[in-house]
Swiss-Prot record:
It comes from the Bacteria. InterPro entries: Acyl_CoA_acyltransferase (IPR016181), Gcn5-rel_NAT (IPR045057), GNAT_dom (IPR000182), GNAT_YJDJ (IPR031165). Pfam families: Acetyltransf_CG. Residues 2-90 form the N-acetyltransferase domain. GO terms for molecular function: acyltransferase activity, transferring groups other than amino-acyl groups. PANTHER family: BSR4717 PROTEIN, PROTEIN NATD1. This is Uncharacterized protein YjdJ.
Amino acid sequence: MEIREGHNKFYINDKQGKQIAEIVFVPTGENLAIIEHTDVDESLKGQGIGKQLVAKVVEKMRREKRKIIPLCPFAKHEFDKTREYDDIRS
């Protein structure tokens, strides 16, 4: 499955083009971004898709030199347990 980038989101579509996973973020000011929500279809649960989506946002925000506020409960959980994200968390 390919993770694609859209406007303020990363997402995955199924073979029919239906979106089956997404993470939405909002750039705020010059150096912040907020992860608003993550949604993964039930058929993909337990496959690490949510983690991959969070990692994509982290990668993009590091390139843009932005810190992240993980408001989404799933993203917050990932930030809490992934020490490699400490440097980018606001």
